[in-house]
Design a protein with these regions (language model features):
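Acetyl-CoA-dependent GNAT
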Residues: 1-51, 55
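Conserved acetyl-CoA-binding loop-helix of GNAT-fold acetyltransferases
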Residues: 54, 60-73, 93-98
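Conserved beta-strand-loop-alpha-helix junction that forms the acyl-donor binding cleft
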Residues: 82-93, 109-112
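Alpha-helix C-terminal capping segments
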Residues: 18-19, 29, 67-78
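Structural preference for beta-strand elements that scaffold enzyme active sites
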Residues: 46, 80-82
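Active-site acidic-Proline motif in GNAT/NAT acetyltransferases
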Residues: 42, 55-57, 61, 87-88
Length: 112
């Protein structure tokens, strides 16, 4: 909830919807503590990566970057990999750009 700046009930509803639509939710752990998560939708011709969130207490320590690196090495990940990032999330843009991702399309609206 804190990683997305959402109320607990909204976070639960978001995760339940993700389970219902067949997306994969990956937990990011450090020392036995879940510090974040990332959601993927793996299709035959691409993988959509979205919903990467790290708890504020653990942000800036490389957990998000490391999680993306690990995911990209998973054998069931298909390429290309697309990202869904809000324009205001400058930190995420910087991380993804540093990993070699490029902006190919911008959406005016996005919702779940």
């Amino acid at each position: 909830s804190a990683a997305f700046d959402m109320e607990k009930e909204d976070s639960i509803a978001f995760l339940e919807q993700s389970f219902d639509t067949g997306e994969t939710i990956w937990c990011i752990a450090a020392g036995g503590t879940i510090v974040g998560l990332v959601l993927t939708s793996i299709q035959p011709d691409q993988t959509n990566l979205y919903g990467l969130a790290i708890h504020p207490e653990y942000q800036g320590k490389g957990y998000g970057r490391d999680a993306v690196k690990v995911l990209l090495q998973k054998p069931d990940i298909t390429f290309p990999v697309t990202l869904h990032v809000t324009e205001e999330n400058e930190a995420a843009f910087k991380i993804y750009k540093g990993m070699g991702f490029v902006t190919t399309q911008e959406l005016m609206e996005y919702w779940y």
